[in-house]
Each structure stands twice: as structure tokens, then as C-alpha cells.
From Swiss-Prot:
Superkingdom: Eukaryota
Compartments where found: Mitochondrion inner membrane
Family to which the UniProt record says this protein belongs: Belongs to the complex I subunit 6 family.
MF terms in GO: NADH dehydrogenase (ubiquinone) activity
Any one GO BP annotation for this protein: mitochondrial respiratory chain complex I assembly
EC code: 7.1.1.2
Catalytic activity: a ubiquinone + NADH + 5 H(+)(in) = a ubiquinol + NAD(+) + 4 H(+)(out)
Function of the molecule: Core subunit of the mitochondrial membrane respiratory chain NADH dehydrogenase (Complex I) which catalyzes electron transfer from NADH through the respiratory chain, using ubiquinone as an electron acceptor. Essential for the catalytic activity and assembly of complex I.
One Pfam family named in its UniProt record: Oxidored_q3
Descriptive protein name: NADH-ubiquinone oxidoreductase chain 6
Organism whose genome encodes this protein: Dugong dugon (Dugong)
Entries under InterPro entries matching the protein: ComplexI_Subunit6 (IPR050269), NADH_UbQ/plastoQ_OxRdtase_su6 (IPR001457), Nuo/plastoQ_OxRdtase_6_NuoJ (IPR042106)
Length: 175
């Protein structure tokens, strides 16, 4: 289980390296869709089957529609591949080397610590109880943590969506 999640995490980062070094919108969108699918797989492997399925259906379904429209509008007759430009190829190889160095560091015994993460005790989380057994459901824990511990993240996300509406209106106003 740990190695499966680790391999999916590496694929997740490699997909975003492909997005950040995109030579053409087609390949950037492909890397984003692949990373989104792997991210949903990571959520499912940690027990969030409902959340992973919803993110997969909503996020990737909407992304595929946007990806289809952008590739139709920005079709290049000869799209630039990752190896066609030395700068783009260097960015891709550099990102992959950094990811490889991180993997080697983690397997050699170096560890990562979460700094400043204090979740308190588990009595506030949703617990299903029976006779002598209790079960903490990860789907509900993730949703409740998003709105309680990540409240400023939700506020900032809403504010960014609100501002992006005005940016889109301003960009398309003159046409």
C-alpha cells in the first residue's frame, strides 16, 4: 500500500513537471489530466472512495470538456513536442532529475515532517460506533477538515473564483 501510494505520488509530480514544461497546449492539458487522474487514485487509496470518485467525475469531466475546446481552438499544424526545443527539454529533464533526487533521498532514510499541523484530538470527528468497536470514516473526516481546519483556504479559493469571473469578463469585453 505504501509503495503504491509512493509510486502514484511520483507519477503525480511527474505529470505536473510535464505541465510546467509544456511546449504546446495539447501536451500541457494531457499532463494535467493524467496528474488529476493519479491524484484521484491517491485519494481512493487512502480510503476516500466517495471523494475520489466525485473529484474524478466533476474535475476531470469538466477538464476534458475544456481540454477539448482549447485543443480545437489552439490546434497547431505541427505542435511542438517536449524534445523539439532545448529549453523545454532542459526544463523537463531538470524537473525529472529533481524528482529522482527526492525519491533517492526519501529511500535513503531521509524523512519529511509536518510542521505546524495540530489536528487536536479525534473526539470532534465523525465516529461510527458499535459494541466495543469504533470506525472513523475518512470521507467525512476529509470533508469536515476542509471546512474547519482549511477555512482560510476555502475563503481564498472563493475569492479567487470571484476575481476570475471579472478577469474573464474584462478579457472578453472588447470582442
Amino acid at each position: 500500500m505504501m509503495y503504491t501510494v509512493f509510486v502514484m505520488s511520483v507519477l503525480f509530480v511527474v505529470g505536473f513537471v510535464g505541465v510546467s514544461s509544456k511546449p504546446s497546449p495539447v501536451y500541457g492539458g494531457l499532463g494535467l489530466v493524467a496528474s488529476g487522474g493519479v491524484g484521484c487514485g491517491i485519494v481512493v487509496s487512502f480510503g476516500g472512495s466517495f471523494l475520489g470518485l466525485m473529484v474524478f467525475l466533476v474535475y476531470l469531466g469538466g477538464m476534458m470538456v475544456v481540454f477539448g475546446y482549447t485543443t480545437a481552438m489552439a490546434t497547431d499544424e505541427y505542435p511542438e513536442a517536449w524534445g523539439s526545443n532545448i529549453v523545454v527539454l532542459g526544463a523537463l529533464v531538470g524537473g525529472l532529475l529533481m524528482e529522482g533526487a527526492a525519491v533517492v533521498y526519501l529511500f535513503s532514510g531521509g524523512g519529511l515532517e509536518l510542521v505546524g499541523l495540530d489536528l487536536g484530538s479525534l473526539e470532534n470527528w465523525m465516529v461510527f460506533g458499535g459494541e466495543g468497536e469504533e470506525l472513523i470514516r475518512e470521507d467525512y473526516v476529509g470533508g469536515s477538515s476542509l471546512y474547519s481546519y482549511g477555512c482560510w483556504f476555502m475563503v481564498m479559493s472563493g475569492w479567487m473564483l470571484f476575481i476570475s469571473v471579472f478577469i474573464v469578463i474584462e478579457v472578453t469585453r472588447g470582442r
